[in-house]
Amino acid sequence: MASLGILVAGVAHEINNPNGLILLNMPILREVYQDAEEVLETRYHEQGDFTLGGLPYSRMRNEVPCMLEEMQEAANRIKRIVEELKDFARQDTSTTTEPVDLNNVVKAAIRLVDSSIRSATRYFETCYSPSLPMIQGNAQRIEQVAVNLILNACQSLPDSEHRISITTLYDQEKDSVMLKVSDEGIGISPENIPHLTDPFFTTKRETGGTGLGLSVSASIVKEHGGSLEFDSEPGTGTIVALTLPCCRRT
């Protein structure tokens, strides 16, 4: 796994450099075309149709702005994929830990993805158990898991009329705290559930999923001595339960 991480880091770096140039230059190209569009339109209306890039301008005048927009979106998508690859390669096993309040971590995660939540659903509910015991861990790493689970829930919804619920609670019997992320999304096929945390396994390949988000999350949870459990029914929704042990009491 360490060798795979090194390979992935190298590939991510090689992809990131040329994509960085695309992201840098695309806004400039879009502005250039906007400035040139007035001249092109004047010629089109005064002299009739002409070719642009070997194709009729009457066609390209509508298609070029769409092409530029698609290129910008594709470059942003590559950037997101590279960031996931780098997260996978990093696999930070830092032993720097501290007492962590799960409620605060979840609230911070929700703030980070607020725009995605608002775009995905009109019905977002939270229920925080009061006075949760502290857990021992790395708050930033646990927040990364919470962000991933919430974004997955957002992406699973067929429309904004479906609900997402976030709940924290304390399991006294197991002396552990739990985060439950429930959605009314499309659900997960039973045969896919055992593979959800496998590296590079994804049911969202066509929309740019890398299959690394849950793999990285599972590694972080394992570092903290916790567990990730999935309960899903196709067409009904999914419940993901993150369980983490509480701090040892002295």
Residue ranges of each PLM-predicted region?
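Conserved catalytic submotifs in the C-terminal HATPase_c
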Residues: 107, 120-133, 169
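Histidine phosphotransfer helical core of two-component systems
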Residues: 14-76
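Short beta-strand-loop-beta element adjacent to the nucleotide/active-site pocket used for signaling
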Residues: 164, 169-179
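Short helix N-cap motif at coil->helix boundaries in the Bergerat
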Residues: 102, 187-195, 209
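Short alpha-helical Gxxx[C/S/T] motif in the catalytic ATP-binding
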Residues: 213-217
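Detector for a conserved hydrophobic position within an alpha-helical segment of the HATPase_c
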Residues: 220-222
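Conserved micro-motifs of the catalytic ATP-binding
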Residues: 91-95, 134-137, 203
